[in-house]
């Protein structure tokens, strides 16, 4: 068991180091984005919502086709991938990195590796469910996809995408400040109250 844990830790360290090397040119931008997403200042949440809202208003106004939208998005990614490693050191000054910044960059890369591992793990579990319990797999997939299709049909796709993107960008800050845990705790308490009231009525 200990050997397996050590092997997993060593593999995590190797993957993290590899990712750090790949994203070295993005280090300054990632640290800045990390501060924004974790709401280190009070005005960051409204700024996130404002930028996302402006972006989606532009998309709504231009009303591009799917092909044009995908092409522009990929083109933007290519430009960012080329320009960010060149411009970021000049803007932020990578030679001024502190030990704390380096440690935080390491933590971000480690969290990204862990997230990728979780996603791969869920993907593998899905396929193992398909092999072990095919009926449950197909029923679950059909019901889930039908629900998603129904929601997509009822709600405007651009609005739905806007809500999803906004929630995903606000999620790190919500977790950092314990807001999600707070409301989950409130929901659990309310559910427990309802269950207790139901038990009393049954008695």
UniProtKB/Swiss-Prot annotation:
One of its GO terms (cellular component) is endoplasmic reticulum tubular network. It is found in: Endomembrane system; Endoplasmic reticulum membrane; Endoplasmic reticulum. It comes from the Eukaryota. Expressed in the cerebral cortex, cerebellum, hippocampus, olfactory bulbs, medulla oblongate and limbic system (at protein level). Ubiquitous. Expressed in all hematopoietic cell lineages, with highest levels in early myeloid progenitor cells. Residues 1-41, 87-133 are cytoplasmic. Homooligomer. Heterodimer with ARL6IP5. Interacts with ARL6. Interacts with TMEM33. Interacts with ATL1. This is ADP-ribosylation factor-like protein 6-interacting protein 1. The lineage of its organism: Eukaryota, Metazoa, Chordata, Craniata, Vertebrata. The gene is Arl6ip1.
């Amino acid at each position: 068991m200990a050997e397996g844990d050590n092997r997993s830790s060593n593999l995590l360290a190797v993957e993290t180091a590899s990712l750090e090397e790949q994203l070295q040119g993005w280090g300054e931008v990632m640290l800045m984005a990390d501060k924004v997403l974790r709401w280190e200042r009070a005005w960051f949440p409204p700024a996130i919502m404002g930028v996302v809202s402006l972006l989606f208003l532009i998309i709504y106004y231009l009303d591009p086709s799917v092909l044009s939208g995908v092409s522009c998005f990929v083109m933007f990614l290519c430009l960012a991938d080329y320009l960010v490693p060149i411009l970021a050191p000049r803007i932020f000054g990578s030679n001024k990195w502190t030990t704390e910044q380096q440690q935080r960059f390491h933590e971000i890369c480690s969290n990204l590796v862990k997230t990728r591992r979780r996603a791969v793990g869920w993907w593998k579990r899905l396929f193992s469910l398909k092999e072990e319990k095919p009926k449950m797999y197909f029923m679950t997939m059909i019901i889930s996809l039908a629900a998603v299709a129904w929601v997509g049909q009822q709600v405007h796709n651009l609005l739905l995408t806007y809500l999803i993107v906004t929630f995903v960008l606000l999620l790190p800050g919500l977790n950092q400040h314990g807001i999600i845990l707070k409301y989950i705790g409130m929901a659990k308490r309310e559910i427990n109250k309802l269950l207790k009231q139901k038990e009393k009525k049954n008695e």
